[in-house]
């Protein structure tokens, strides 16, 4: 598996200016307010991972440094992965609103390292899933923006032509056997993925983050 570069940004909410950067790649770390230094650092990685990278970090970077093309990177978002892999209880590294639990506020290096911990916990949780459930998640989610990067990293682009049948076989009587499942697969794969994750752990004990329910 290829190495992943983890990072975080501190953004001024008043003007969108990025004040500070933190990063971790293999054994190297970065903590700087210098944008050019940050850009040089992330060139080391093909896969970029941050907590809420899709809706926070990348949009902030694109606004602050619009001449840089971030599309060449494959993005992995631990915000979306966490409730998929840990639906049964509040994840211990996350606090209210699924922000990262760190020792210092507004320290992007600490947040980048916390993201790294979250990612490897997610990776370990995924690796112990039954193979059939891995294939269901890959087939359902690997072409969505929220999960595409993760499955590219895992080199898992499995796409089943009989996904409905595979879901029904794996979950059995835990889910309703009706034709609406095909519509959910086609139109709401992410929502269905989260629902299946909850069902898989006997959903009465699950805790779903508020942002997922929205």
Task: Name each model feature, range by range.
Residues 1-214:
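DEDD superfamily 3′-5′ metal-dependent exonuclease/proofreading module
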